[in-house]
């Protein structure tokens, strides 16, 4: 998925990007590629967990500002955890099948969230 984002690049980041000849969007793309619940929870010794940890800390700090159906969140997080546990136990493949199964749960959760938001909008008409 591709999206256009307008961003005010802070001076410190822009300075480093200039020094190292890296475009700011490349930094953000690299960061975005590393945000992954399935990888975060299946590769506990992995070195690319920091982006997801940052995302989790952001959620924790912005808890009052997000509109999350906590019942739906609890249901899908439990399903996600159960799915990962089963897949990790059944397959000795360094979490490959667990990550794929985890992504499927995340996709189902996303569909449920979108359906709930659409229902909310349509019910208001």
Question: Language-model segments: which ranges?
Answer:
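Short, basic amphipathic alpha-helical segments that act as recognition/interaction helices
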Residues: 20-49
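Charged, low-complexity interaction regions
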Residues: 88-100
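Amphipathic alpha-helical interaction segments
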Residues: 39, 58, 62-63, 84, ...
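Short amphipathic alpha-helical heptad-repeat segments
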Residues: 73-89
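Short Lys/Arg-rich basic patches
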Residues: 1-9, 18, 47-48, 53-74, ...
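An amphipathic, hydrophobic-aromatic interaction surface with interspersed Lys/Arg
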Residues: 12-14
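C-terminal non-catalytic accessory extensions
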Residues: 28, 98-125
């Amino acid at each position: 998925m591709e999206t256009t984002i307008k961003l005010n690049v802070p001076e410190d980041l822009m300075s480093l990007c200039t020094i190292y000849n890296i475009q700011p969007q490349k930094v953000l793309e690299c960061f975005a590629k590393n945000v992954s619940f399935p990888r975060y929870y299946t590769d506990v010794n992995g070195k690319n967990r920091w982006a997801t940890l940052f995302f989790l800390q952001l959620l924790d700090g912005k808890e009052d500002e997000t509109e999350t159906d906590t019942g739906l969140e609890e249901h899908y997080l439990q399903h996600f955890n159960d799915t990962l546990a089963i897949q990790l136990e059944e397959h000795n493949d360094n979490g490959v099948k667990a990550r794929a199964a985890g992504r499927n749960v995340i996709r189902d959760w996303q569909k449920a969230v979108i359906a709930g938001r659409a229902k909310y909008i349509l019910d208001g008409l």
